[in-house]
């Protein structure tokens, strides 16, 4: 007998219309997106820690594979071929599968600086990884095998302890008399810190256990645990936990299986509270050991979903009495609005709980007005407990005692939506609360007032990108997503585990055929504010750079750069205060983004606006090497105090500095000859100068680059003078000897070049004085030289003096023929055939300034994948690695681990362990070892 369904009989033929019984059954098969949403909501309902993709402040994007067994990393990078920015290919962290022994990976969490990654699996086991040298080189520092395999240990809440460092921040930008004024302040760190400045991770487990994983100064990890106090056994089974650091300690909110929210305040005491590494070397100090002090604030929060008191006079007992049972908590957060002052004080935190109806939920009867998600908020407040007046009549032996303050939660108005909320994120350094929905739409709110950012309400005040009118266009939805460091990009995972990049957009004042200058200006100011916040917090700003390149015109980019120099208070006039130039924290950042804006590919010459900052960045690099070399060789004892690797670095940069100096002289000689025909006609001279584009001329006229040239000359003299007294042997003698021979063979002596710089100083000074420009007026033309790469009118007399008097007077002290015959193509600044050929056939190590092997075919010429995959960390001798900068696409080869302590210290001092001289992060060529 055949089965009844084999005859194709429809259910409706048996029971009538599909809607006649109002069973609430779906009329069609759920789509893949519906299934994905249902699965995502289930994940969020069951456990609070289910972040499968995370973007670190260093720029590394980590994501869990679709089968939950692997972690992949990727990042933003600039393409060598055309200078366009996009996501890199994935690099798998194969060691993760081994570390977690096949357990399903469920959660990712980066620390505040973005250098350490915590990976949690379904059994609550946690492994930790660090980024030592490159964005795609992630090494394990803590094994998950240390943790027990226990379902009750599953992580429901996780937070890295803050790092003890104060950073520069910016509160807002306000337009004053037609110009934007930025509000900088130094933000002090808040909360508990590891005394040894090591990593510390606080976790809350499903069984109500709080544990702190912390790293000792020797690199080993330890942990302490304590149980959260609960009112009943059912309260011990937690589903979600939220943690935030405040001035009074760590605030913890938990949600239990019996649907209660409890609040705790936790303090961590370290013994000793201070850590001095020098005392540890003497064996007189123990490692810091933490301990918990836990206070249960005894706040249990009942809730009605949605809130029954939204409308005044409404009977709470009659409004949707059944709806609370339909909702499940899907996320729990504690929001701490951003501080706007240097003291670190912040407004009171508030708790955010998102409740959603499952997609498969069956309603008792049609209720179209029931929202899919409800955002419930409680304000955390402190009030004094008051006693009944009768207690005043009771005599007390102890006199009037102080009444302890009481912590209360005041429920605020709910926020409802017909769409499901899939994430709540505090972005833009705490200045924006972003709520993401299942249809890919994102709503932005002010964390202090919960006012929605729907556009520009006040065009004269800018606090964030979202407030200034930036928004995300609707795109195919990703159910797992993470914001970039500046929150102007989103990376998301779709149902198939594929990664997608979403980019913020803005009209920039062009709307409906009209132009609004105020909206354009606010957009530029908000981008400036975001970039400056990244600079102050030492955060990766490649996401901002992508926006600038893709969306801004050249004029708008110039406007942005002018705002950056003003916001960061960069005084471009370094005629007198030259010593401040070497340690200025923001000059490299401003130069780097300016150079990157004009980069159109590795094999194309930069335009003049990009070449000027790119040359100054490299001058700064060379100028910093010599004082660092002198500093680290002081007091070194032994038969060979000079490190061969360091001397090789000094040798390469010495050759580069000399050739760049000769390149400037060669161009000056050519310009002097070219302008000789108009030397007697000032008007013709001025017109010819307007049509002349010369990198060497701008480098000489700018006080910033001229100061770097002077520092280099000082270093070259010190290197040459120190050779006679240096005890050298082996490779050190070979390299140091070659340095001195290179200096001796130069067509121009160092003292002669310093004489040229002094002549330029005099010409520039007289030009400023003749025009009546004092110290307050000079930054203007100096900034025009740097940002616009144009010679301002006030400096035209200086150019005339340099070409007519300074250069001709020094011809006799230089070997003009040797300068003319020099090969400067390897410097990379020219657009002649020789420079073009060198760019396509060779690479130059951007740090060591030494040529790298020729390219073969279309490859990079940087070694095979097999050679890179060896990495050398597996043996103690180190291995040669090729790293490429994700921003400028330049290459550097290095030994890792470094062969000597001095070499490592120099690399660390110069800031080149993880980043290039331009500030871009390294990408390991060939990928990561297995």
Swiss-Prot record:
Listed Pfam families: Med16_C (PF20719), Med16_N (PF11635)
GO cellular component, one term: mediator complex
Location in or out of the cell: Nucleus
Disulfide bonds: none
UniProt keyword ATP-binding, yes or no: no
UniProt main location, coarse: nucleus
Annotated keywords: Activator, Nucleus, Transcription, Transcription regulation
Gene Ontology process terms (BP): positive regulation of DNA-templated transcription
Record family assignment: Belongs to the Mediator complex subunit 16 family.
Stated role: Component of the Mediator complex, a coactivator involved in the regulated transcription of nearly all RNA polymerase II-dependent genes. Mediator functions as a bridge to convey information from gene-specific regulatory proteins to the basal RNA polymerase II transcription machinery. Mediator is recruited to promoters by direct interactions with regulatory proteins and serves as a scaffold for the assembly of a functional preinitiation complex with RNA polymerase II and the general transcription factors.
Subunit structure: Component of the Mediator complex.
Designated name of the protein: Mediator of RNA polymerase II transcription subunit 16
